[in-house]
């Protein structure tokens, strides 16, 4: 959520800032704003409710000159979406401007203290409290901006990524972070600042990922300086980031989401590259090689995740338990961190997050560390916080995912969990050789079978028009298909705003069957596997109650075709790999229904791509 961009250098800052905000639109937001220091030392703050395009329209006749500036997209946490509550916020004197991602937990206490000292506030936000606090300290003690920020952060409780400019010190930007990401791009006599690498990569591939507790000082013509609140200088690694600008463009597709759905065959190929050797019939994960003892000695594995990543975790649980014979628990990270879990050094904790910045998952990792657990991270964003906080892990290597509703990250996570389960099972000797070889071979064929499945796009597009009337959907699956049903329901909810629920098919008769009537479409994942006959019975029960059945079936299934209203035939694969195939039609169905309803599929309302606050 919330996107931060900053620039200081020889260029005009405004175009850089606007383009950066556009690159961060995928994170979700309800308002946007910018603050610029012009060549005469004037500070100009412009902000508005709505999109970045609305901000550009608002600024069309404004003074947007200057080579120093910050900009922000806001997703409301304190105070309703409005131009007043939008960032940047400025101090009472109008000398300072700040942008902020995160939550200041003790803002109410700080605000009360400042009000008692005579300060007034324009907005309802926690962010304005912080900029007023910085200026109060600055004026009371006659300090420079850096020292004032350091003292202010001493008093702050919470998570934050902030950037400040001061028109009295116009040649610098101060940035700081705690439990919220910030990246600095180092150019030629210039610095770029952002929440992630996407706004920066067009200008430089040299980047510094700030660690928790860091305060960065960016001054034109000087080296990057990083200190802590006690003004102790910190070592800051500057790394070269391998990310191409073309990877974050739409590439001719109408939406990022559709582009990312169609990228999945290539993404899964990239995910498996160097990890699966079909000729040698072998799976190699460096993390398993390097940390074999810690992983194989685990008495239990806890997987923590949120949203779509949690659904991937459920599939990983079945893979690991089936083939490694290690008990696995899957928990929402938000619940795990607060329920006093019984964990110890005998446990391995797997943390899954596309962005690597999910606040609850990061907090769960911190808790696991306190209990001496061995921690394995599965992430997409290279250099993000979770990989830096874990003992080892695997990147999914699916490239930037811009659409808020996750698609290719889900299949990437499932692929890595499958590789992990196979590698561990092989090392433990808990999988039969013929089973291992057959799964490895079939896994190598998944990208081609994904391509086959994507050829159903036109069919699913036509199908979606039939069901735009629906107010509710039910998704059913069993075994490995149950998490796919959950994920399909989530996708529909996220982008079409249609209520949808995913259930194990066997649980239908324990409640959901009461909802089924002629207005209730039911999506059933009914491929040929050990529970095929039982799922067939579920379909017959739905039809007996006049429900509309959309069935995902194995190719050539005539039996279900006779009774289902709509049938989508899928390429055959092994049961444990079916989620990688079956999820694609559900992604397409959600996408096309949302498009038919005129929804913004890339930026659905109230959602954020990277949830960096609780």
Predicted regions located by residue number:
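Glycine-rich, anion-gripping cofactor-binding loops and their flanking helix/strand elements
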Residues: 183-205, 334-368, 507-543, 573-587, ...
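Active-site phosphate/pyrophosphate-binding segments
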Residues: 264-268, 272-302, 392-521, 594-614
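Glycine-rich phosphate-binding loops that contact phosphosugars or nucleotide phosphates
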Residues: 293-438, 442-445, 525-566, 589
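Glycine-rich oxoanion-binding loops at beta->alpha junctions
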Residues: 71-84, 279-292, 316-352, 499-515
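Conserved short alpha-helical segments that host acidic/polar catalytic motifs at enzyme active sites
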Residues: 1-250, 254, 266-300, 338, ...
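Structural motif
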Residues: 68, 96, 300-302, 348, ...
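Generic C-terminus detector
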Residues: 548, 561-563, 573-614
